[in-house]
Each structure stands twice: as structure tokens, then as C-alpha cells.
Design a protein with these regions (language model features):
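ASCE RecA-like P-loop NTPase motor cores
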Residues: 1-511
């Protein structure tokens, strides 16, 4: 036993876990229980899942797998050339002639696999190029109908890849058996090499799992994407549309009672949306009254001048958003969070508004441009009036109470992009299940995200803030009324000209 065994940090952690009455983990750690060979979390009478509205998307994200040809080639090259892993294994197995032979075969198999992989991607690239002019750096959906037109060469490469993977897995199993059965005879240095080797073995198993599903499993639950970088490099990716169905996970039966908590568990009076996404049929729902007086402390406006989203170009939309930001900052001189659904539009607005506000001594911070999320939030909350342009994670998890944030702009209703192949595939899957994609998935999901955006403003009973939604579909579209229902009772949405909104804001925010 190693002299540091008793103070090993991982053993210390597991010991603390075994002694604890309460364990706190994030959603991703919980979702990964279904992917682990052995569970890391103990069985328990109780499981409490806070911010449970995140669970479906996180479970789906954790179940997604990808193989990147560039990263794969770098990994293999790194192990063979830089780390000299297989040279070290040959030395370790000096007394094991059979294992030395396996190591040589395994190393050559890896090199052959990388070459075949590039050849397969070349044929996959040709397959998509037949029907689409521009495919590099695009998200492309691989369907059964399309793969049936794969060339004979592509079919041969795919079969060779599967054979090579099977050979690699067989050798991995034999080497693991030898190592584990003779573990006490190997030195500490040898065991460190084995740790790196086993980590790589796990990666090959993952690639095998991903590739097998990508080519052979055509159940509706699986969505396959091809993301080419050039002719012989790219990514393949699989997504499991049923990953969020909790009764099918490995961890769900290990808990007797599960409590799901969140400020956005329901959509208006609809309490079925989240349970349906999680595959739950029998749930007891309890709604607690909010401690916040939204009618008194919050306002929601839709400017009458807002441009028609459907007809506006990205430049026109960017110009309108920039003008709105400038007008608000000229009057209020308060920090403002502006939320986007498109990084392209965010960048357009940044480059339009940043020079204008900089002349007035006001800083504009933008996600993906001004540094890391943590760095941006730190600069944003420094007490000086500035503007933060954000997307994705900035819609939630931003905690800026009091006067740190009193103005929030939503540039566009937060619907998923229906042109994305993954979204199209998900909607087709839901339709096949008898679910109306727009009414029963897109609208509720957008509504809950809108509610989360409002939650950035009111973080305590003393907070005051105003939300401007620059998308007139909220008040003109038929589904707008359904979206509005997600806001707390007593909080109405007012449509008014921008000068009137500015006048009301002056009085409201300076109370």
C-alpha cells in the first residue's frame, strides 16, 4: 500500500460522502449517473432537485456524444509520440510476450482507425455535397434515407471502422484482465501508466458506442448530426431525445421520493409541461405564494415602434436595438442587461452601439467579446452605469440585486431556432408521438425562459425593475396571450410609444 494512500484526496472525499447525511451535487453530476458503470451516489429515501426546469435539457446534453476527428488524431498522436505510452507498455510487459504482441497490434490498429476515419468522413462529406452547395461548418442531419445513398467506398470504410473498433475492444479486454490479475506485481510507476491507458480505453469504448448508434440504430429517439470542417475532418454527434425521461434512467429507481422545486415549474395554469418532459405520470403539485410584490415593483413594456421581426434584416434589427439602448442610457444612466437569442445579432449590436456609448464614458460588455462570463459580470457590477449584452446562460443565473440591475431588455421572444436540424428532428419526433411541437413544446419553453428573464430583475422584496420586450409578437400573435400568462399575477404588459415608456420609467425608477 502506498504511504500516501490514507491521505489520498479522492479516498478522503468518498469517506466524507459515506459519512454525510446530505449530499449536494449539480444536475450534470446526477444525469451522468446513467452513464457510469458504477453509481457514485448512494441510494436514499429522498432526492431534492432544485431548479428542476433545467433537468430535461441537462439530461439531454449529458446523453449527447460526439467524435471529433481532429481531437481523435491528436489524442492518438499524443499517446504514441509525445507520451510514448506504447513504448512504456512494451517495457512493462517484458515478461509477457503475449501482451507485448497485443500492444503492437493495438498501436497499429489505432493508426489504421484514424486513417479509416478520415476516409469515412471524406465519403460522408461527398454524400452531403450531392444535395447541398455549402456544407462546411454547417449542422447537417443524417437520416436513414440519406445514409442509404452512401457510396460503396463509404460503406466499406464504415465496415472496416466497426471491425477495427471491435478488435481494439477485444485487445483492451485482454490487457485489462492481465493487468488486474497481476496488479500486485507491477510498480507504482507502472500503475500510473495503466491509469492513462485505462482512460484511453474508456474513450475508445465511448467512440464505439457513439459510432454504432450513429450507423446502426435508427429508432426515432436518436438524432444524428454531421458537422464538417473540411473534406476529411469533422464531427459526428448523436442526441437522445428520450434522455430526459426519468423512469428510464439508472438513478431514478434508487430514490423513494423525489421533490422537484423551481420558480418556473408550470406554464400559466398548465402543470403538465415539465412532468411530461420528464416522463412523469403521477405527480403532486404544490404552489407557494411569491414574497415579491410584482405589481408594485416591476413593469413590462412593449414599444409600439418595435420593428417587425419577420421582415427586418439583422442590420435593421441591430440598429433598432442600438437606438433603444442609447435612448434608455441617455435618460436613466443605469446599468442595463440586454438579452439575445442570436450571437450574430448580439455582435451586430455591440459593434453599432459600443462606439456611441464609449464617447459618453459608458462601457458596453458583450458575451464572447469582452472576456469570460465571470469577468464580464464582475465588471458589470462595479457600480458604474454600463450595458451588458448576453445570450444563453445570461438569461438565468445572473444574481444582481438592488440597483445593480433595474433595466432589462429582451430583444426577441426566446424561441428555439426552428431551422436548426436538431430542433427540426425533435419537433418531428414530438409530432410522431402525437404532440403539437409549437403549441406544446416551443411556446411553453419560450414562456418559461421569458419568466426566467424577469427573475433577473426582482431578486429581493426591495428590488424594482423594468423589462422591455422589443418583439411585438408578444401583443400581436395569437400565442402572445399564452406567453403573457407566465408572468406573475398583477404584472400586466403595457404596449406604448417609446417616449411614453421613457416618461413612465423616469417616474417609476426614481421613486
Amino acid at each position: 500500500k502506498d504511504e500516501l494512500y490514507e491521505v489520498d484526496f479522492l479516498r478522503h472525499l468518498y469517506k466524507k460522502v459515506a459519512q454525510s447525511n446530505v449530499l449536494i451535487v449539480n444536475h450534470a453530476f446526477l444525469a451522468q449517473e446513467s452513464l457510469r458503470k458504477q453509481p457514485l451516489l448512494p441510494e436514499s429515501p429522498w432526492l431534492i432537485i432544485d431548479e428542476a426546469h433545467h433537468l430535461p435539457d441537462i439530461a439531454s446534453r449529458m446523453a449527447s456524444e460526439r467524435v471529433n476527428s481532429v481531437i481523435l488524431k491528436k489524442q492518438v498522436t499524443h499517446f504514441i509520440e509525445k507520451e510514448q505510452l506504447f513504448v512504456a507498455l512494451q517495457q512493462i510487459f517484458q515478461q509477457f510476450s503475449e501482451e507485448q504482441r497485443f500492444v503492437k497490434i493495438y498501436q497499429q490498429g489505432l493508426l489504421d482507425f484514424v486513417d479509416e476515419w478520415q476516409d469515412f468522413l471524406f465519403e460522408l462529406h461527398r454524400l452531403f455535397s450531392k444535395t447541398q452547395k455549402r456544407i462546411d461548418h454547417q449542422e447537417l442531419l443524417l437520416t436513414k434515407e440519406r445514409i442509404d445513398y452512401l457510396s460503396a467506398a463509404g460503406e466499406k470504410h464504415s465496415q472496416t471502422l466497426q471491425l477495427l473498433l471491435q478488435e481494439l475492444l477485444t485487445i483492451q479486454s485482454k490487457l485489462q484482465q492481465t493487468i488486474m490479475s497481476q496488479l500486485e506485481t507491477f510498480s507504482l510507476a507502472d500503475r500510473i501508466v495503466f491509469v492513462r491507458l485505462f482512460q484511453f480505453f474508456d474513450e475508445i469504448e465511448r467512440i464505439h458506442h457513439c459510432f454504432t448508434i450513429y450507423l446502426d440504430d435508427w429508432r426515432p429517439r436518436w438524432v444524428k448530426e454531421y458537422l464538417p470542417q473540411n473534406e476529411d475532418h469533422g464531427l459526428i454527434e448523436i442526441h437522445d431525445l428520450e434522455a430526459s425521461l426519468l423512469p428510464e434512467t439508472k438513478w431514478y429507481p434508487r430514490y423513494e421520493r423525489i421533490i422537484y422545486t423551481s420558480g418556473t415549474l408550470k406554464f400559466g395554469n398548465n402543470k403538465k409541461y415539465l412532468p411530461q418532459r420528464l416522463g412523469l405520470t403521477e405527480v403532486t403539485f404544490k404552489t407557494l405564494p411569491t414574497p415579491y410584490n410584482y405589481a408594485e415593483n416591476a413593469r413590462v413594456y412593449v414599444p409600439e415602434e418595435a420593428v417587425a421581426i419577420q421582415n427586418a434584416s439583422s442590420y435593421e434589427m441591430g440598429q433598432y436595438i442600438s437606438d433603444t439602448i442609447e435612448k434608455l442610457m441617455a435618460q436613466e444612466e443605469r446599468s442595463m442587461l440586454v438579452l439575445f437569442t442570436s450571437h450574430e445579432l448580439l455582435s451586430t449590436v455591440y459593434h453599432q452601439v459600443q462606439p456611441r456609448l464609449l464617447e459618453k464614458g459608458q462601457e458596453v460588455l458583450a458575451q464572447g467579446i469582452s472576456g469570460s462570463r465571470e469577468k464580464i459580470l464582475k465588471r458589470f457590477s462595479n457600480g458604474k452605469p454600463n450595458v451588458l449584452l448576453g445570450a444563453d446562460s445570461f438569461w438565468e443565473g445572473v444574481d444582481l440585486p438592488g440597483t445593480a440591475l433595474q433595466l432589462l431588455i429582451v430583444t426577441r421572444l426566446p424561441f428555439e431556432n426552428p431551422k436548426r436540424p436538431l430542433v427540426q428532428a425533435k419537433y418531428a419526433y414530438l409530432e410522431a408521438e402525437g404532440i403539437q411541437p409549437f403549441a406544446q413544446e416551443a411556446v411553453p419553453k419560450a414562456a418559461l425562459r421569458l419568466r426566467q428573464a424577469l427573475g433577473r430583475l426582482i431578486r429581493s422584496e426591495e428590488d424594482r425593475g423594468a423589462l422591455l420586450i422589443l418583439d411585438r409578437r408578444l401583443v400581436t400573435a395569437k400565442y402572445g396571450k399564452r406567453l403573457i400568462k407566465v408572468f406573475p399575477k398583477g404584472l400586466s404588459v403595457k404596449e406604448a410609444p417609446m417616449p411614453e415608456i421613457l416618461e413612465e420609467l423616469k417616474e417609476f425608477l426614481n421613486k
